[in-house]
Amino acid sequence: MNIKYILPALALATTSAWAQQKELSSGIDKANMDLTANPGVDFYQYATGGWTAAHPLTPEYARYAQFDALAENNRKQLRELIEEMAAKQHKQGSLEQKIGSLYHLAMDSVRRNKEDYAPIKALLEEVQALDSRKAVQYEMAKLQSMGIPNFFSFGCDADLKNAKWNLMQVYQGGISMGERDYYLENDEPTKKIREAYRQYVKNLFTMTGMNAEEATQAMEAVLKIETRIATASYSATKQRDVEGNYHKMSYQKLLTDFPGIDWSTLFLLNGVPAFNEISVSQPEPIHEVEKILAECSVEELKAYLYYKVVNDASSSLSDRFRQEAFYFYNHTMSGAEQDRPRWKRAVAAVEGALGMAVGKLYVEKYFPESSKQRMVELVKNLQVALGERIDAQKWMSEATKKQAHDKLNSFYVKIGYPDEWMDYSKLDIDENLSYYENMVRATQFMSNYYVEKHVNKPVDRTEWLMTPQTINAYYNPTTNEICFPAGILQPPFFNAEADDACNYGAIGVVIGHEMTHGFDDQGAQFDKDGNLKNWWTEKDKTEFEKRTKVMRDFFDNIKVLPDLHANGQLTLGENTADHGGLNIAYQALQNAMKLHPLDKKDGFTPEQRFFLSYGLIWANNTREAMLRQLVKTDPHSPARWRVNGALPHIDAWYKAFNITSKAPLFIPKKNRVEVW
């Protein structure tokens, strides 16, 4: 339900109704812990050691975490719902038919192996027949309309400085390894990945009929183009600079400043109506694309587009293509040893194409209304606690505090599922067509849906950016909203059978984390209405940056592996949100216990259970290759350091576990982060 909650001035909602109805558990299972570990030496091991020992990595996983354990259960529930649809005949065009037919197609590997790459053969021949730069530009626009990314990407989202309206936007893209560092860095692990990528690209060319010499030449063209784009692209850290990634201009100025790209054909083929303004988020890589289109030979440009078609289609073709892509992207880059079973891939495909339709079925069967009601109260409690935390900041002026309260009071809260569901009537799934062709249809449907909903339209705050079955949560700065899908509202994050100490330490911190994103180094740049607009006094802004620098420097000094440090700037927003989430949720727990005190349970005080619950949600096992990939690309710190790096900055943690100055995790109070 989409409800806008205004923070009450004095009222404090509690979860007492549930507590009064029955005795709730501690929520702590000692089997998940390693009681031989010292919490002051390695709290992560202490809180999660039993769980990690009981969940060794299987060949399918490069990382297995609490999120994945919960996802496995969700996936089984979704499989049951989807296979129920697939087992019956339904009227063509009905939602049940679309779900069932797409699942049939995804499961039919015999048919796909027989077809091999026939579903894309005509498209590849079309690319090979291109004979001019103009034809290349037309083809790149056409491929974009099919959901095949190339050179750069574009979309239509909220205008950062006029957040009530959507704005056309162009973004860097076009590099198939995703992160520029894979093309540019020369440490041994990165060089090995780059060499494997060269082989992967070459293999895709030989698998579609080229001889070895032709494939090598085409591969070199792809690497040449992608390396040029990567060199001009913004790093993951630079992309976090909100102001530095906003370059709004008129459509006419786009044509003038970037004349080397056929924009009119691009937007025409993608069904984008005429518009007046656009933001080129990262101008430098777009200028580099102009140069590439002008300087590279037509044969090189064709090789790049040809590869993009095959690479994008690989997971929807025969097993030999799927396995080739798995070996590079999942094994070489991430460390997974075995692909997911076919039914899991099929469920993921249906979710990807018909996510909200599946979500509606999921909510109806598995999400109790009582969970939403309890979440409403928890969110209110966290809002009160954040308000108190804002008031307690001695470094912040009253003027800035007032602006912060205004923003907090304007939070738009979404819990469970949307009020209105997506209309899939314009999506046609036809089992007479190949699996690949149907997946292209699904992509085109989503593209058309968002063009119709966004271009030249005001922002719809009721729109959900995640499906209800998603095990995650988010804060969106341009709508100033926090969203908690039904998928995350279950153990270990939310436990209706456990008391407040457990729930505030888990889902409470998640709620506080998302709220804090409204006040982290990025979110703090947006006002209560979602506009990129300064609301800080100069003195307060300087002090805020000084305090977040402590966080950045602390994580920069963490050694994730002997030859690999964490990236404090890339992870600054998430680390700040973890810090704020812990402080806010702990404050909310203390408020709740003033009215309804909690006793020691299973040998742990409420405060200890709070921190143990937090630690457990980050339990995971991760392969080294995946860990290296995450440090390059993920704005979140590795799970161990979301515990061992975050908790030593929380004063209450020391008291709860009697952590002394002799403990390795101890940080002197003057060196601890104190932001929210």
Where are these regions (language model features)?
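Short, solvent-exposed loop/turn and secondary-structure capping segments
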Residues: K30, A54-T58, F154-G155, E179-D181, ...
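Bacterial Sec-dependent N-terminal signal peptides
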Residues: M1-K22
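Intrinsically disordered, low-complexity linker/terminal regions across diverse proteins
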Residues: A71, V222, D257-G260, S279-P283, ...
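Noncatalytic, helix-rich "gating/capping" subdomain that lines the substrate-entry/channel surface
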Residues: M85-E377, N381
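Short, Gly/Pro- and small/polar-rich lid/capping loops
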Residues: Q21-A31
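Short secondary-structure subsegments characteristic of cysteine-rich extracellular domains
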Residues: L12, E60-I82, E213-A232, N503-V509, ...
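Hydrophobic/aromatic-rich, well-ordered segments within soluble, folded domains that form packed cores
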Residues: N32-A53, Y183, D187-T206, E398, ...
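Active-site-surrounding "flap" and adjacent substrate/cofactor-binding loops of secreted or lumenal enzymes
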Residues: A37-V41, Y46-M107
